[in-house]
Amino acid sequence: MKFSIKTIITIYIITITIWISKTIRLKAFSFYHTTPQIDSLLENLPSQCLPFVSINATVSKDTSLLKYYDISFNNPEKPNQPKDKVFILSGEHPREMIAVELVFKFINSLCKDPEYLHLLDKNNFRIIVNANPKGRINVENGELCIRTNIHDVDINRNWGYRWSNEIKPNQEENPGSAPFSEVETVFIKDALTSFNPKAFFSIHSGVYGLFHPYAYTMNDIVNKTEANNMKTILNIIKEKYCKHCYVGSPAQMLRYYSYGNCLDYAYDVLKIPYSFAWEIFSKKIRFEALEEKKRENELKHLINPLKVRKTQDKQFILDNIPTSFIEKTYTESENQMCVNHFNPMDRVSYDFIISNFQKGLVETIDYINSH
């Protein structure tokens, strides 16, 4: 088969374009961990954290190449000391990469940071870092706005409490064909149920919010003691770490109903008295402390602040990333903005968000231990 010169040139241009776009994409996400990197680091945790950690790796039913990791932390040196149980979950929605990074950093701090040892004296942890690995890999490969799993199901609408199938299947909050129809949801539910924790954290991004139940209704929590305990600590965290965060019920704060979600299941079905959903980043809101960090960094590196801000306003990273998104509810321009909305795209912002909310997470756990 012979190709014309025009065809050969076209193929060459397409090949170069794909290579350049992939290079730009990798550069844009260079400080985010990929799924293979996360898996490798988790596999090596026992050798770094002994005797504190054990790993349960479950092979996915969808492919033998992927595993779901369930990490347990405890301090066996104090076996008779009463401890609280804390369950932390991230990665349900693949495009929310910063949520996974926060929890991954928290795991490493439990292993290596002496300031975190007191948490292991008082708590047993069970942590799922990357709850939707196949979806996450698609995001890493350029499909930057994916919220669902490989079956186009939102696994945080697939829980068997107040589940509803009113959402059309082509929308990104598709709840699935039935409650717990998805392997990811079943995996999380089994781990959460068997652990029976005192506290549950589900970490996300997209807004700034520190939420307690409910997400499916605007009704208040009936148990006033539990409601007050959750509101008290969330308001403390808001004041110290996120002054513009919404605090309260997501349904009430956002005027938006989320059926079949893990937050309400954890609280109403499993009776976990401290059930939280944290939203830790949104591009739409300026974080005063973060802006100060950026200004300090600009001065430190002798960069013209006005030039930097002008470049950022032009979305210089995203405009150069041609992508193929599977979501049908976004326009092309919205797709290009999507990853930037859910995740910080510069290193200063990335480091600040992780450090800031990690401190908030530690303080929340300390509060729970004292009550």
Enumerate the language-model features and the residues they cover.
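Acidic, glycine-rich loop-and-strand cores that form catalytic or ligand-binding grooves
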Residues: 218-253
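Active-site/substrate-binding loop(s) of hydrolase catalytic cores
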Residues: 80-92, 96-228, 279, 325-344
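Classical eukaryotic N-terminal signal peptides for Sec-dependent ER targeting/secretion
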Residues: 1-12
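Phosphate/oxyanion-binding active-site loops and adjacent basic polyanion-contact surfaces
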Residues: 34-38, 60-64, 96-100, 180-184, ...
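Active-site-adjacent mobile loop/cap segments within catalytic or ligand-binding domains
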Residues: 200-202, 208-224, 260-371
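N-terminal signal peptide
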Residues: 13-31
